[in-house]
């Protein structure tokens, strides 16, 4: 969507971009000179979409001068996150308890949902951490609780970790330091030798011994800012 592609649409409450691969919003794609709406417009788009820094501009010009409108006055709703929420194969999970999770048929559904969740972008995951699947739980929170019940997820302090259903991908996120306790957690200890891919989704610190016995490790996908204690090599040789 190019410059001034969507201009002065002050009465439009919902915008749907249905390209399954995402959309590119250029600078000034949305322009509201003197006519920013009194509500927050909903913008539905795939999380792979690319938004220019000034994709919505002229928000505080003319009659709107001094109103302090920003792009936060739009609701960005990611369609791939919504597709996960509406997936019929996963609908029973949102009313399931920990005891139900251990039933073989249910555990299989949880594993499939975990794999689907892991494949989502960070933006889509963030939406699932906010959207409610019932009156108290978010979709991400409920799924993680069920995954813990069958040994596919856990916590060490402020670090959360999950392992894929095939046991080959270990994902860690959170804040603070990943300690040697990681290698000593029972379910990790039993599976760590099969981990081929390590995904580090947040800028944590990895302490010596945290990745002990990860002898099959082939790839590490880490965000910028991950640190290691003392600058030492914490990865297995």
Residue ranges and their predicted role:
Residues 1, 9-24, 38-51, 167-175, ...:
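Structural signature of tandem-repeat unit edges
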Residues 5-9, 29-30, 210, 234-235:
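Periodic small-residue-enriched repeat registers in elongated scaffold domains
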Residues 12, 119-129, 179, 217-219:
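Short loop/beta submotifs within extracellular cysteine-rich repeat domains
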Residues 22-26, 48-58, 124-127:
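Short, charged/polar "capping" segments at the starts of alpha-helices
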Residues 32, 54, 111-116, 156, ...:
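A composition-driven surface/loop motif
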Residues 34-89, 148-156:
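Extracellular/surface-exposed low-complexity segments
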Residues 80-151:
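Beta-rich interaction/scaffold domains
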Residues 102, 109, 151-191:
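N-terminal segments that cap or nucleate solenoid repeat domains
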